[in-house]
Amino acid sequence: MVRIGSSLLLATLAATTVSAASDPPKCSQDSHCPEEWPCCSLYGQCGTGAYCLGGCDPLMSFSLDSCTPEPICQGKTYKDWSNLDNLASNTKYLGDASKSDWVYSGYPKVEDGNLLLTMPKNSVGTLIANNHYIWYGKITAKIKSSRGAGVVTGFILLSDTKDEIDYEFVGADLTNVQTNYYFQGVLDYNHGGNASVSGGNTFGDWHEYTIDWKPDAITWSVDGEVKRTLKKESTYNETSKQYMYPQTPSRMQLSLWPAGQASNAPGTIAWAGGEIDWDSEDIKDPGYYYATFGEITVECYDPPSGADIKGTKAYIFKDKAGLESSVQITNNKTVLASFGATGLDMDVGASSSASGSANKTSSSANTVPSGNGGSGNEPGNSHSGSSGSGTSTSDGSGSSTGFSQGSETSASSNKNAAPSQNERVLNGSFFAVLVAVVALVTL
């Protein structure tokens, strides 16, 4: 769910006004971003531009309006994967969801009318996020997972305040898919569970996976068969006096990443089935690990009862509670003029961006967050929950747990990114990355 880079190997445009420092400022609940770099990314780093788009955490940013408003839900079916025209690189995307439904980092491909997420040798994989947020709805995808120890495929919903609903496929176990959920990133390893898949081959066979997210319940289904149901009422926490239930607008994300990378936490590697084999059958031919996505559908539900509706275009947070009641639907614009712009001033750099000037308005370390396709809630993490409420209640569905996928990973335009893993842990009530060394190469 979240990653905060401990160091970044920068490969930026020749910028005249960008700081030479290799590390962006860090952010947490107790240390918000400075006004100069007001947006807190999923990785707990501060910046402008893409830092302020999808994944920007308003609770750790300079102010709630540092992050851009997020495009409202759009019901749609995606089934023509004959090209990648509907995907924008995260080093190019500035928030116009009307031009690109998806933003990506890594190595997406198309083959036989399907979308492939690929992971070449020693790379950090691929992550694709839908640019239209969902505030309750149903998502369904036809998937053939990746395979192999240490290789993980994700199909999830993730909000900017780190509510999360997951499907995770561990390549060492092709007979099951893992389900999980989180509220504001609070770690509770009792929230996970395994769902068996008929035929016992998530890699070789197509299966249809559905998340049906309603204000009062979440249902996970495989091939139309309900595998798990979570009732909101079962998530009430007596300590915090609140429901630890995913309830804020979320992005659909698809990912493939190396959970079994040698640099990861031992518990993470064990959960992933062992260290990844970079000389495996798939690495030899076709030359990469891969997960295959076919038709993907999004059905948007009506806003919850009592929702604060002031428009029809975008979601914003109006208070720092990060709850369903904190969300407002507005007509605010969602598009930045440049990578130097933020939610505080979305028109910064309009003229220089148009002229192609290489300065803070170009993509760089402090304007495009970097990470990889996996993050968060990893086994072996000893850190505790975020809201000071202790461990949230469990629905008793099992104790299995896995990673959740984040967003905003940087795309490499040549070769492979450095093999590192950004893992989410909690720092007070927010996240800090354990490992993040990614070579950022802008397109």
Swiss-Prot record:
Compositionally biased intervals (Low complexity): 350-367, 378-410
Keywords: Cell membrane, Cell wall, Cell wall biogenesis/degradation, Disulfide bond, Glycoprotein, Glycosidase, Glycosyltransferase, GPI-anchor, Hydrolase, Lipoprotein, Membrane, Secreted, Signal, Transferase
Subcellular location: Cell membrane; Secreted, Cell wall
PTM annotation, UniProt: The GPI-like anchor contains a phosphoceramide lipid group. The anchor position has not been determined.
Effect of inactivating the gene: Does not affect growth rate, germination or sporulation and displays only minor sensitivity to high concentrations of Congo Red, even when all crh family members are deleted.
EC number of the protein: 3.2.1.14, 2.4.-.-
Designated name of the protein: Crh-like protein 2
